[in-house]
Amino acid sequence: MRTRFILSFIAALFMQFATVSADSYTDGIMKLMNNDAMASFNTKAFEQMSQIPSVNSGYLTGQFKTDAVEWLAGHYRKNMSEKDFGDMISFFMQPEVLAIQKKVLSAAASSQGQDAMQSLMPQMQALMTGGTPEDLKEPSCDPQLKKEILRWLEINNSAESVKASMNCAKGLVADMAPEGVSADQMEMMAKMMDGMFSFMEKNMNTLILTALAGKVDLKDMQTLNAIEKKPFFASYKKANASLVGDMSTFLDKVVAGMRK
C-alpha cells in the first residue's frame, strides 16, 4: 500500500492545476493538463493521498496547483519560444495523442498496473529480511514495441524524473509512520525504503513495460515518439532537462507543504 501511494504521489504531482495568472504558457499548460483522462486519474491519486492522516490535503487541492503551474510555466518560458511552446501544446492536444495518453494512464491505474506493483512483493520481502532481491523479469513484448517504449522513456527523461521524485518521497517516511514507532524501527523502515527505491530505479523500465504491455501498440508509441521529428523538439528537450534538473528543489517544497 505504501509503495502504491508513493507511485501515485509521483504520477499525480504534475497533473491537476488551478487558475493562475494567465499568459500563453500558463494557459497552454492548463489546457494540456486539464483533459478528462488526467482529471479522472488525478481524482483517484489525490483520494489515495488524502487517506494518509499526516498529509495536508488542503495544500494539494489549493496552493500546490498554483505552485506547480507557475513552476512548469517558468521553465517552458525560459527555454521555449511562444511559437515552439504553442506548437508543442498543439502536438499533445491532438485527439490521437490524447487517446494514447488515456491508454497510458489507464494502464497505470488498471489491474495490469497493479500486477506490475504486485510483482514487487517478493523483492520487498527480501529487503525486509536483509536479503538481496532478484531483478524483475521482462514481460513478453514485441521487440519493436519495447524499443519504442524505452525510447519514449528516454525522450521524457523518465529515469531522472523518477529518481528525483523517489528521493523526495523519502521525506514522507516519518510522517507516514504510525504513532509509537521507535527510532530503531524508523531506521529499519528508512533502510528498507532506500533499498526499495534503489531496486525500483534499477527495474523501472521493466515495471513500465509490464504495465504497458497489452495496453499500447506499436503505432501508439510511434505516434508519441514522432515528437522527435518536430521543429520544436530541440527546445522541448532543453525545457524538459531544465525541469528535471530543478525537480528535487520543487518536490522538497511540495513535501514541506504536504506535511501537517
Residue map of PLM features:
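Bacterial N-terminal signal peptides that target proteins for export
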Residues: 1-7
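Bacterial N-terminal signal peptides
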Residues: 8-16
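Boundary at the C-terminal end of the N-terminal hydrophobic targeting segment
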Residues: 20-22
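N-terminal Sec/ER secretory leader and immediately downstream segment
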Residues: 24-116, 120-123
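Extracytoplasmic/secreted envelope proteins and their assembly/folding machinery
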Residues: 26-30, 46, 69, 73-77, ...
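Surface-exposed, polar helix/loop patches in the mature regions of secreted/periplasmic/lumenal proteins
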Residues: 81-139, 215-245
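Extended amphipathic alpha-helical interaction segments
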Residues: 115-214
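A cross-kingdom marker for long, charged
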Residues: 194, 198-260
